[in-house]
């Protein structure tokens, strides 16, 4: 359902426009250019201090990871999701409303996909049909590296965060080294 929904959304977007659409909304651009400056940083060749910063997309993503981690670990909904992911038949026999929980999970999935698209647009300040093509496989591989089982029932958002960091580090190292073939990285 989720991949089919993605392909449907991508197709509908292609009907609207196949050109890149730059975002010119002032509030959106303020958000995109905002920085959370840190008290540390580096100096340039002239000795001028350049503070380190964190973009708002990283802050929002970290807040979402923490909220989802708490939801999955300490709330009934999260425990139901783990039970259904582990074994749907057992969850049904325990008296859990599997259909309702799955429906709620798809609602949460849709919200998080929309938020991810918003954060992606904050980074690029533009929208394009082919912009995030192939990132679904990056997301799946990062989750697996972080310890999530594709069969379900096992995995944490914090583990997935570490999977994203590990995959990003490996991709960056391969790109900057330039010693491996181009098919190793997108």
Segments (PLM) and residue ranges:
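Short helix-boundary/capping micro-motifs
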Residues: 86-87
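Transmembrane helix-bundle core of multi-pass membrane transporters
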Residues: 2-77, 101-103, 124-129, 176-185
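Hydrophobic residues within membrane-embedded alpha-helical segments of Major Facilitator Superfamily
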Residues: 5-7, 64, 108, 112, ...
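Short hydrophobic alpha-helical segments within the ABC transporter permease transmembrane module
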Residues: 97-108
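A gly/Pro-rich, aromatic-decorated transmembrane alpha-helix motif that marks the paired
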Residues: 12-15, 19, 115-118, 161, ...
